[in-house]
């Protein structure tokens, strides 16, 4: 999920709300990474070097789980981040497991 640091859900930071939702739903692993720079579409590149980027710096939320679990949580994530980019990829777990 590609979010902005200023995005909110019920007056709380969206990335934290997404992580809380995923935790509550028992998703295996999730993380939010604050980017130092980025852009979306035709918008300007925003960087962390700007004193006040106006909440436009990217925050990327990534999570890992089975297809079935992703299918179950995805509708709510689409609602929470209706205005943002959500990307889905199939991955191969090289080490560890989802137990």
Where are these regions (language model features)?
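Positively charged, small/polar-rich N-terminal and surface patches that mediate targeting and assembly
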Residues: 1-99
